[in-house]
């Protein structure tokens, strides 16, 4: 069977061809971590992947957004699908041709099998329970979580590294239980500012580095004289347990 489908991806494709060639897509039971410094583009990358997975490929996808509301996620997704900059959507300064693009994009987003849960301060146990329901009732094939640092554990007084370890092990176990890929976003430490991130710089790095099957970093070379002017982002596959 693998021989006959040797030119196809065996997992859920991300829509990024070079990444998919390396990973053959996100595989069932894999725990994938996407890490970056704040404001580098973790959520934007995840939304780009979800656009390809759910909107373009019609693969059922779950998204736990612990940082942004359903409305903000909807606006950003609509901007991506319509290819209309977000500032134009927010300001209302649109041209006549934009309205047809918006209408088409809204229809595609509405019909996409993308299930967004935007409950803030969501407990780990609740995420696990909701994920099970999404798979059982909606046939979800992949889940994204934004982001690890906002998941609430049972013992909030425990040291941060212990809480991250509990979350990491639980999400890895959940991916195996549900037999789907789970993609969790994570911040990296301030040490990575201006440099390419390393596995040791993931928040709570020991457990996440051990539990994750794939770790992908986003890196942008910010110009020193203007921190808001950025170059293209680079995706770094720092770990691939089942890769070559």
Stretches with model-predicted labels:
Residues 1-21:
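N-terminal pre-Walker A segment at the start of P-loop NTPase domains
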Residues 7-8, 86-96, 114-121, 152-165, ...:
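Flexible beta-alpha connector loops of hexameric P-loop NTPases
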Residues 39:
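Walker A (P-loop) phosphate-binding loop of P-loop NTPases
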Residues 162-244:
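Phosphate-binding/switch region of NTP-binding enzymes
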């Amino acid at each position: 069977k693998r021989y006959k489908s040797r030119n196809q991806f065996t997992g859920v494709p991300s829509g990024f061809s070079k990444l998919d060639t390396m990973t053959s897509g996100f595989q069932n039971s894999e725990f994938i971590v996407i890490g970056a410094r704040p404001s580098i583009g973790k959520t934007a990358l995840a939304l780009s992947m979800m656009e390809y997975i759910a909107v373009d490929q019609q693969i059922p996808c779950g998204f736990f957004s612990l940082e942004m509301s359903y409305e903000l996620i909807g606006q950003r997704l609509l901007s991506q699908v319509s290819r209309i900059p977000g500032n134009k959507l927010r300001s209302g300064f649109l041209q006549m041709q934009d309205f047809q693009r918006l209408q088409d994009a809204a229809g595609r987003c509405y019909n996409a099998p993308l299930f967004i849960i935007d409950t803030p301060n969501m407990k780990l146990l609740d995420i696990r329970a909701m994920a099970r329901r999404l798979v059982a009732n909606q046939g979800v094939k992949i889940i994204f979580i934004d982001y690890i640092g906002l998941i609430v554990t049972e013992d909030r007084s425990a040291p941060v590294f212990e809480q991250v370890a509990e979350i990491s092990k639980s999400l890895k176990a959940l991916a195996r239980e549900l037999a789907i890929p789970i993609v969790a976003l994570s911040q990296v430490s301030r040490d990575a500012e201006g440099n390419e991130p390393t596995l040791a710089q993931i928040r709570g790095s020991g457990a996440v580095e051990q539990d994750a099957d794939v770790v992908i970093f986003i890196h942008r070379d910010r110009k020193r004289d203007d921190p808001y002017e950025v170059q293209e982002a680079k995706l770094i596959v720092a770990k691939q347990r089942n890769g070559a």
